[in-house]
Regions:
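Short, well-ordered alpha-helical microsegments
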Residues: 1, 91-94, 226
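Alpha-helical packing segments of well-folded alpha/beta enzyme cores
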Residues: 2, 64-72, 176, 180
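N-terminal carbohydrate-binding/catalytic regions of secreted carbohydrate-active enzymes
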Residues: 2-5, 22
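A short, Lys/Arg-enriched amphipathic alpha-helix followed by its capping loop at the start of a domain
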Residues: 4-11, 183
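Metal-dependent polysaccharide deacetylase catalytic core of the NodB/CE4 family, i.e.
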Residues: 9-96, 101-106, 110-130, 159-167
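C-terminal domain-boundary segment and adjacent tail
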Residues: 17, 21-23, 73, 107-118, ...
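A polyampholytic, Gly/Pro-enriched intrinsically disordered region
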Residues: 129-139, 210-217
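A short, acidic, amphipathic alpha-helical segment used as a generic capping/interface helix at domain edges
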Residues: 137-154, 206
Length: 245
C-alpha cells in the first residue's frame, strides 16, 4: 500500500487528517493504529469534518482547526501545527489565513500547482509543485535533477519538489506511486522531508545571527544547518559559532 511503498524508498510524507471522520469510516486508519502506520511521517490537520471554509465564519474555522488539532494531538502526543485547506484555498476572505495562524498553525498547503521549485513566500499559503497525476511530472523531475547541478553542487539553488494528492485517487494503482518514488529516490543530494521538517529547517535559518563583516555565524537552534560558501559546503553546527574563512 501507499505507506509501505514510501517507506521502501525512504520517502517522507505528511498526512492531513479529519479527526471527526475517522471513527465513522472504518476504511480509514483508526486512531489506535496511528503509531504503527504513520511512524516516520507527519500527521497534520485538515479540519475536523472537511467543510468548505468559505461557508464558515472565523469562529467556525477556528473550531474546525482547534478541534481537529486537539484530537490528533491526543493521539500522536505532540503538537500538530500543519494544515491543508479542504477543497483548496479558492476564495480567501479577510482574516481567514490570519485565523489559522491564531489557531497555532505554522503552515497551510493549497492545491494550486505552481510547477515551480521555490520555497513559499508565505507558509500559510503554500502552493505545491504538482499533483501526483500531473501529466508534466516527468518533465518537472528532469528539470529538478539537472545533471550539471549534480556534478557542481555549489551551483545549486535551494529547490523544493513538493508533490501532493489523495490516497483514494490512486484507486489501487500503486504502480504509479512506485514509479514516482523510483524516479525521485536515492539521490544523495536530496533531503527527503515532511512539511513540518521543511518549515522547521527554514525557520532555523531565519534564527541565524551574523556578524557585521559576515565572518561569524551563530546558530542558536538545535538543528545543524548547511550552507555553501565559496564553493565549499559548510555545516553550521547547532548551538555553535562558525568562523567563515
Amino acid at each position: 500500500d501507499m505507506i509501505s511503498i514510501l517507506n521502501r524508498y525512504g520517502m517522507k510524507a505528511t498526512f492531513n487528517l479529519n479527526a471527526g471522520r475517522i471513527a465513522n469510516q472504518p476504511q480509514r486508519v483508526q486512531f489506535e493504529d496511528f503509531e504503527e502506520v504513520y511512524h516516520g511521517h507527519e500527521i497534520a490537520s485538515h479540519t475536523f469534518t472537511h467543510p468548505h471554509l468559505n461557508n464558515l465564519d472565523l469562529g467556525g474555522i477556528a473550531y474546525q482547526v482547534v478541534k481537529d488539532r486537539e484530537l490528533l494531538e491526543e493521539v500522536v502526543q505532540k503538537p500538530v501545527q500543519g494544515f491543508a485547506y479542504p477543497y483548496g484555498l479558492k476564495q480567501e476572505f479577510p482574516d481567514m489565513v490570519n485565523c489559522l495562524k491564531c489557531c497555532g498553525l505554522r503552515y497551510a498547503r493549497t492545491i494550486r500547482n505552481s510547477h515551480r521549485f521555490t520555497l513559499p513566500e508565505d507558509f500559510l499559503r503554500w502552493d505545491p509543485t504538482c499533483h501526483h497525476e500531473d501529466p508534466e511530472f516527468d518533465q518537472l523531475a528532469d528539470k529538478f535533477f539537472k545533471p550539471d547541478d549534480l556534478e557542481h553542487p555549489w551551483r545549486i539553488k535551494l529547490k523544493l519538489f513538493y508533490i501532493w494528492g489523495h490516497s483514494r485517487e490512486f484507486n489501487g494503482n500503486w504502480e504509479l506511486l512506485d514509479r514516482i518514488c523510483q524516479r525521485l529516490a536515492n539521490k544523495d543530494i536530496v533531503w527527503y522531508a515532511t512539511n513540518g521538517q521543511i518549515v522547521d529547517y527554514v525557520s532555523a535559518f531565519y534564527a541565524l545571527r551574523r556578524s557585521v563583516n559576515g565572518k561569524f555565524i551563530y546558530n542558536p537552534t538545535d538543528v545543524d544547518l548547511y550552507v555553501c560558501v565559496n564553493k565549499q559546503n559548510i555545516v553550521l553546527e547547532k548551538g555553535k559559532i562558525t568562523i567563515l574563512e
